[in-house]
Amino acid sequence: LDSKTKNELIFASITVSGTSISTISNSEGNFSIKIPTEKQNSSLIITFLGYNNKVVAIKELKPEKNVLYLEPSNTMLEEVVVNVRDAKNIFLGVLSSRLQNYGNEPIQMTGFYRETIRKRRTYVSLSESIVNIQKQPFSTVKQEQIDLFKGRKNADYIKLDTVNFKLQGGPFSALFLDLIKYPNFIFSEHAFDLYDFSLEDITQNNDNQVLVLAFKQKPTNENPLYYGKMYIDVNSLAVISATFHLNVADKAMAGLQFTRKKPVGVDVYPTEVRYQVNYRQENGQWIFAYSRGDLTFKLNWDKKIFNTIYSTSFEMAVTDWKKQDTKEIQNTQKLTSNIIISDKVSSLADPDFWGEYNIIEPEKSIESAIRKIQRKTLNERSID
């Protein structure tokens, strides 16, 4: 929580000191983290953009219901302006500094992935999985490999009505939000022909000053592009976080980017598309840590008075990592970039399913949906 306003700090990074074990707070500011017995003398390090880092000894924490407060950082604008030439040069500096900021070696990561689909306010699909990722450096065109370690799901196809609404890409959708590895997701080599850049604000990340670089598509470009903000460390010019939205003003054009196939007589278009990606500093370099997408679609039927609203969210947090060995994933659980994860994993039932693995603590609405699913599954088993 913010120490002054007591507001929740969402998507804050939580790391066990001296290790690569980590998680992230959810959209309600809550988190849980599983700590090995041999690390009980370590500390938790909580970081959040615009705040001083919080370090707390694990032994001082209760098993649950701890409340932690972070202090807002003080920004000294005058010291930064002297060193900033213009927004265009800042972005060029980001691109030219990628090697020193993000390294050139592959990394073996463990990640937790969750995706949900709601029909209006009701959850109709929930999928979660632990994945092993062979994360490739930005300097190679080689795509990441993802191995499904374990996962669970539930989908209520009755509530899905006549549309079998599914999210394609699974964990790859989250990885493709890595703007350092995949800059063409937003920025091509002609970025300055497509976007206007501006220096919007200056904040802090612990003791380091951070530039807030805003971007939006040029008004002369009619194709749906993105608008948003990048948060850039002023000393290294590393992107430490970014939030961005798709311009959905042209419904038909925006809809073409997402709809693979649809029934005859229905128009599908997005009403909101929002993405976020965070990076974490480890041993002087920044690595991919978390990403999230929130998308809302409207379905208009030719012969129906009312439309249908579907909302889908996906997120992935890196919970552990190490230097990668040279072996590629060779088993049958290797995922492809067009995977539909809800078709790949088993039913949601066991409340202790994740064991020792760290996950993103579910929001209250998701937690309630999980409990309902587990009760329903247990009732069905008892009837059988």
Regions found by a protein language model. Give the residues of each.
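Structural motif
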Residues: 1-9
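Short, acidic Ser/Thr/Gly-rich low-complexity loop/linker segments typical of extracellular
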Residues: 20-30
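Short strand-edge motifs at loop-to-beta-strand transitions and within beta-strands
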Residues: 31-33, 64-66
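Short Pro-Gly-centered beta-turn/loop motif in secreted/extracellular proteins
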Residues: 33-41
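A short, solvent-exposed loop/turn motif at the edges and junctions
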Residues: 45-56
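Surface-exposed, low-complexity/disordered segments
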Residues: 66-196, 206-209, 259, 264-384
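Extended beta-strand-rich segments in extracellular/periplasmic secretory proteins, especially
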Residues: 183-234, 238-245
